[in-house]
Amino acid sequence: LRTLAQVRGVPGRLEPFGGHRAPWVVVDAAHTPQALTRVLVDLRTHARGRLICVFGCAGDRDAGHRPQMGAVAERLADQVLLTDDNPRREAGEAIIAQILSGMRQPARAVIEPRRGLAIRRAIATAGRDDLVLVAGRGHATRQDRGDHQVHFSDRAQVQQALAERRGAHFLEVAA
């Protein structure tokens, strides 16, 4: 991952953040069962600790993928945090329920509909050797909610959460 961090790739595609006293965090646009499988299998080879997956599924899109995505994440990640993606005109809770329906042990999934908080939680609770995948939105910078769009960037949220974590760590060390 250190080498990957030095390469300028496509924003939102296996894009690494963190490292150096913080967990590695990877943002990827994986939004199908096949893409999520591929990225989790690839990242597993780099995870020295837990592999944590934060994702949701888009609204008004292929609902049949949702249970499959839940099954993939449960099988390949050590911890799963389910959240909103782009709910569009669908209820986020209904989308998450469909994802959970594909899991054998849905009670083990952490549910935080507010995507920014889900990202922060995953990064705040990850150990230095853990690897966090934030999947589904990649480089997107807006979220569709009903009839309106709001600015939202996984990449910016990850950077902010890592900065907050570094600040909290600095305060703990300085105290």
Describe each region flagged by the PLM.
Residues 2-175:
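ATP-dependent carboxylate-amine ligase
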